[in-house]
Amino acid sequence: MSTAEDITQERVVDIMRDERFVMLSTATADGKVVSHPMTPQEVTDGANVWFLLGLQGDQADAIRVNPHVNLAFAETGSWLSVSGVAEFVEDRSKVAELWDGQLDEYFTGPDDPNLGLLKFVGQSAQYWGVPGGGMVAAVKIMASKVTGSEPPGQMGTVEL
C-alpha cells in the first residue's frame, strides 16, 4: 500500500460529507472505549462536525469526562478515522437549524430540554483506501499476493 500524497483536509471533508452514518467513540470514566452510531448534521470546511444528541445518557456523560473522541467512517474499500475534541454548545437557533424530522423518534422537537448540540473539532485524520472498492479491491489484493507486487491502495494522515 502506498502513501497517499493527495489526502488533504478537503478530501477528508468530502469523505465525511458523503457518509450518512458515523461511529463516535468515547472513553468512559473507567477507561472503556465505547462507540455509538451517529448522524452528522453538518460538516464544515474546517473538518468540524455538528451532531444532535441526548444530554442525559452514557455517551454525553463520557464526553463530559473526556472530550477527546474519534469518528470512524467506512464505505466499501475505504476507511477514515478522525480524532478530535467534542464540546457541548448552547445555541438553540443552531439546534433549530439542524433539526431533522427523523429525530422525532427520540426527541419531542427542537425545544426538547434533553436535546443537545455537540460540536466535534477534527484534529487529525487517517485514511485507508483501495480504488474500486469491495470486490475489485479483493481481486487486486489477491493478484498482488500472487505476483508479489505491492498491494493496491493508499493510506495517509493529515493534521486538520
Identify what each model region corresponds to.
Residues 1-4, 85-160:
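Charged, gly/pro-rich active-site loop segments
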Residues 1-20, 157:
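N-terminal leader/targeting segments and the immediate start of mature chains
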Residues 14-30, 69-73:
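A short, Trp-centered hydrophobic/proline-enriched beta-strand micro-motif
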Residues 27-29, 54-56, 74-76, 83-87:
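Histidine- and/or cysteine-centered catalytic micro-motif in compact active-site loops
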Residues 31-37:
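A positional/architectural concept
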Residues 38-41, 86-87:
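Hydrophobic/aromatic beta-strand elements that line small-molecule binding cavities or substrate pockets
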Residues 41-77:
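A short mixed-secondary-structure module that forms the rim of ligand-binding clefts
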Residues 48, 68, 79, 85, ...:
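Structural motif
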